[in-house]
């Protein structure tokens, strides 16, 4: 095989050996055609690559060299892990090669009593992508040796739970109850400093991540610690003698940079003041020089020797002997370059991107409230104020008076020498590419065919149904249009062409040849003569792992819709449903042609259903032609009793949910073809898995969109019924309306309108008449049936429940309720009658006395 490459195209010459095909099921070309030429042109992707989604986790592939080719391949490259020396050369640890993405905001945190400082710090740590990715993959809980409370296990558990709890509220009880395990200075239900809590929490996590027996402040501990790999850096304190220029360097690890903002109005200015050169003791001779052996004047400078992976900046908003907070605005930007402030050797860039802002509200340094703002991987900012999670604009974030800033180091320009994206294997089980050569005129350049790739997780443009990848013994599907030949062809398909799949294996060229045992299904359409030419080759028994149909399935259904560019004459949709059998003694080639006068007068839209059987069942076919004006239905001369569209669950399905067109079981018979003329295009409903009975119902969308309004009322849908048997065959014992989605949809719309009118009436009744009263029985009576009916008939809406009467004596503890056995009496209660009579007499006397008192007497 010879490969000739250029900047934009690849030409492949493949030599075929007819004797290499042992199955003998594929048609082989003549001996003269010994070489087949391929020409593949690559075009840049139109949409940005967002990475692969792997089930519930959010791992993705990050492109470290965006300047290279924009071509993205769905196939898995060789899983070669980057060399550790290459990563260390650019300042990255080998353990931090993977990152995690937060496309959606997680859960809010409940305030358990002055725990806003804890909630804000936890949210900022949760959305620190390097920390979350490491905690997601690390198996620390299995090998944890800490007796009692482990801060690293608690953070790992919290991060995993918070990422999956979208729209919920979590209570960090484990961290709040063990607050004194973080530091002895903390007390429950007391306001604490967020920066102090974060530093103590990271130190506790640092100790828990070390193996047993390793001191926490040793150089080996800083090198092994997970916390210092992410947040840790090194500061260089340099003292320079004024006389001999001798320099004394001291290196100290740090987890954050505390900057003085008393004389700085921006983050850049604060960093410049932090790394500025200053005189020791205002120029006094207090420094003992090692070379001069005397006390001399000296200068001191602090610089960053080793830049951390995650830079945490603490802005000092307090001063000694001052209770008020420094409430000045310090400007900060979304990106910062630390190169001017780093003195040590470094490779690559030192640019950081802002992802978290922690804010303190209040004028005093002893009290107040904490909240934070975090940025997700999609670039959206969210305000996390305890359990309140709100999306905000970037301008709102930069207007805050920040207390702590969180930056993450960019990895775009740090390119390892032999870097390849490492992908987990299970992510490719459902994202294999299927070879579909699109027949659009726009995609053909200089007569060459552009090979597109489509994943199983998304619908392909132009209405093509996604199929599984071209694996061993898997058919390759080709669709071509605008052929110039006007006569029908009876030649059998030659060697299986177009078996390339866009897949890279072991770093080779991104072209892979399928198994020779896989057939080709080719559909061509001549637009000039409006003739339909079809070639079909039965599919042999497929035993490959990536095959379209497995051994236990009965048949495979391929839907090959064709869509022509709108500027072509006679352009329309021609859709073909082909049933490919997989079981049988031997596959036979069958070429179906149709060249009659009826086909010449075909309208723009046509539906063809072809059943290619192997073995005992005969060959059955049926054609549904939708006339443009009169909606006439032409039926084929061959009588068809049924068309079996049976397949197992694994046929054209994947373990995870994918967008697939909804299909229904179609009874292919003359009287059942009178359907789908007035159907409207349905909206995308909830995605569901295919049932055991796979069916194909292909609807011409362009014709329906034109005639949707015209033929909505006068539909020519013929009612029909069908019943699916247990083995998947379709019987016609009873008749059931098929394709009556217009009627069902209209009835649903009418039902929704009636319900909306009732709801509006109920709302008006509640607003005008008030909430309907509820009749409560007396202490020894029951509600009569008329009263019950009357209370219910006044209004359909109700408050939902009736509260118990308020018993003040019971609430005060002076009275104890005793359950009394309920007894029902048929007649009236004589005691109640007597009490009512006395009450009426008393009321009558009372009203009479009031009336007499108001009467004026003349003196």
UniProtKB/Swiss-Prot annotation:
| Gene3D superfamilies (alphabetical) | Cysteine proteinases
Its EC number(s):
3.4.19.12
Similarity comment text for this entry: Belongs to the peptidase C19 family.
Segments of this protein annotated with the region Disordered? 1-26, 722-749, 822-859
Q: Where is the composition biased (Polar residues)?
A: 1-24
Q: Which cysteines are joined by disulfide bonds?
A: none
Functionally, this protein is described as follows: Recognizes and hydrolyzes the peptide bond at the C-terminal Gly of ubiquitin. Involved in the processing of poly-ubiquitin precursors as well as that of ubiquitinated proteins.
Matching SUPFAM superfamilies: Cysteine proteinases (SSF54001)
The gene behind this protein is UBP23
Q: Which PROSITE patterns match?
A: USP_1 (PS00972), USP_2 (PS00973), USP_3 (PS50235)
Q: Which InterPro entries match?
A: Papain-like_cys_pep_sf, Peptidase_C19, Peptidase_C19_UCH, USP_CS, USP_dom
Chain ranges passing through the membrane:
none
By what name is this protein known? Answer: Ubiquitin carboxyl-terminal hydrolase 23
Could you say which enzyme class this protein belongs to?
A: hydrolase
Q: Name one GO molecular function term.
A: cysteine-type deubiquitinase activity
Residues the record marks as active site = 116 (nucleophile), 369 (proton acceptor)
One GO biological-process annotation of the entry reads:
proteolysis
* Reactions that this protein is recorded to catalyse: Thiol-dependent hydrolysis of ester, thioester, amide, peptide and isopeptide bonds formed by the C-terminal Gly of ubiquitin (a 76-residue protein attached to proteins as an intracellular targeting signal)
């Amino acid at each position: 095989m010879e490969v000739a490459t250029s900047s934009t195209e690849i030409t492949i010459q493949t030599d075929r050996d007819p004797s290499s095909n042992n199955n003998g099921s594929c048609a082989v070309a003549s001996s003269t055609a010994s070489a087949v030429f391929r020409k593949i042109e690559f075009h840049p992707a139109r949409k940005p690559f967002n990475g692969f989604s792997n089930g519930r986790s959010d791992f993705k592939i990050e492109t470290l060299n965006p300047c290279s080719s924009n071509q993205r391949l769905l196939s898995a490259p060789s899983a070669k892990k980057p060399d550790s020396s290459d990563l260390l050369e650019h300042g990255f640890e080998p353990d931090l090669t993977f990152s995690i993405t937060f496309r959606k905001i997680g859960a809010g945190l409940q305030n358990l009593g002055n725990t806003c400082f804890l909630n804000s710090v936890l949210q900022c740590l949760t959305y620190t992508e390097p920390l979350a990715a490491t905690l997601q993959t690390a198996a620390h809980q299995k090998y944890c040796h800490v007796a009692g409370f482990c801060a690293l296990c608690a953070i790992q558990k919290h991060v995993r739970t918070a990422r999956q709890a979208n729209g919920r509220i979590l209570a960090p009880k484990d961290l709040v109850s063990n607050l004194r395990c973080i530091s002895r200075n903390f007390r429950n239900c007391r306001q604490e400093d967020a920066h102090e809590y974060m530093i103590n929490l990271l130190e506790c996590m640092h100790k828990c991540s070390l193996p047993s027996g390793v001191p926490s402040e040793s150089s080996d501990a800083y090198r092994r610690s997970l916390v210092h790999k992410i947040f840790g850096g090194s500061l260089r304190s340099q003292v320079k003698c004024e006389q001999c220029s001798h320099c004394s360097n001291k290196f100290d690890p740090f987890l954050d940079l505390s900057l003085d903002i008393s004389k700085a109005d921006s983050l850049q200015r604060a960093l410049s003041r932090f790394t500025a050169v200053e005189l020791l003791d205002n120029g006094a001779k207090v420094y003992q020089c090692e070379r001069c052996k005397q006390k001399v004047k000296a200068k001191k400078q602090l610089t960053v020797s080793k830049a951390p992976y995650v830079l945490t900046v603490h802005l000092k908003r307090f001063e000694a002997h001052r209770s008020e907070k420094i409430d000045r605005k310090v400007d900060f930007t979304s990106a910062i370059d630390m190169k001017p402030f780093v003195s040590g050797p470094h490779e690559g860039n030192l640019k950081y991107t802002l992802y978290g802002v922690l804010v303190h509200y209040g004028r005093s340094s002893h009290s107040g409230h904490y909240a934070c703002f975090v940025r997700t991987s999609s670039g959206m900012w969210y305000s996390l104020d305890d359990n309140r999670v709100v999306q905000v604009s970037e301008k709102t974030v930069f207007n805050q008076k920040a207390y702590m800033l969180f930056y993450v180091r960019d990895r775009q320009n740090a390119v390892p020498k032999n870097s390849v994206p490492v992908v987990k294997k299970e992510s490719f089980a459902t994202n294999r590419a299927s070879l579909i050569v699109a027949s659009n005129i726009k995609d053909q350049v200089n007569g060459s065919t552009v090979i597109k790739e489509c994943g199983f997780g998304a619908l392909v443009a132009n209405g093509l149904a996604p199929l599984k990848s071209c694996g061993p013994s898997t058919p390759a599907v080709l669709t071509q249009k605008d052929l110039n030949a006007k006569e029908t062809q009876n030649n059998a398909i030659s060697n299986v062409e177009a078996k390339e799949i866009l897949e890279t294996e072991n770093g080779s060229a991104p072209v892979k040849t399928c198994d020779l045992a896989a057939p080709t299904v080719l559909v061509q359409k001549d637009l000039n003569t409006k003739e339909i030419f079809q070639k079909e080759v039965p599919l042999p028994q497929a035993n490959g792992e990536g095959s379209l149909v497995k051994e236990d399935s009965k048949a495979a259904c391929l839907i090959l819709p064709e869509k022509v560019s709108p500027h072509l004459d006679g352009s329309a949709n021609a859709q073909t449903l082909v049933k490919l059998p997989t079981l049988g003694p031997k596959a036979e080639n069958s070429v179906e042609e149709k060249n009659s006068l009826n086909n010449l007068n075909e309208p723009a839209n046509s539906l063809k259903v072809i059943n290619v059987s192997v073995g005992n069942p005969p060959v059955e076919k049926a054609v549904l032609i939708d006339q443009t004006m009169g909606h006439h239905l032409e039926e084929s001369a061959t009588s068809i009793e049924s068309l079996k569209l049976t397949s197992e669950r694994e046929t054209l399905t994947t373990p995870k949910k994918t967008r697939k067109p909804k299909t229904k079981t179609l009874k292919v018979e003359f009287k059942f073809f009178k359907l789908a003329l007035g159907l409207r295009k349905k909206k995308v409903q909830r995605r569901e898995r295919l049932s055991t009975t796979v069916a194909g119902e292909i609807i011409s969308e362009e014709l329906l969109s034109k005639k949707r309004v015209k033929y909505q009322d006068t539909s020519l849908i013929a009612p029909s019924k069908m019943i699916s048997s247990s083995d998947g065959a379709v019987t016609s014992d009873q008749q059931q309306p098929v394709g009556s989605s217009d009627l069902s949809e209209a009835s649903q719309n009418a039902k929704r309108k009636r319900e909306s009118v009732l709801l509006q009436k109920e709302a008006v009744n509640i607003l005008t008449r008030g909430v309907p009263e509820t009749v409560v029985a007396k202490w020894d009576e029951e509600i009569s049936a008329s009263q019950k009916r009357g209370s219910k008939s006044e209004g359909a809406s109700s408050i939902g429940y009736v509260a118990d009467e308020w018993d003040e004596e019971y609430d005060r503890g002076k009275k104890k309720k005793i359950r009394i056995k309920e007894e029902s009496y048929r007649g009236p209660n004589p005691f109640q009658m007597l009490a009512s009579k006395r009450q009426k007499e008393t009321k009558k006397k009372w009203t009479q006395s009031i009336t007499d008192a108001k009467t004026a007497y003349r003196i």
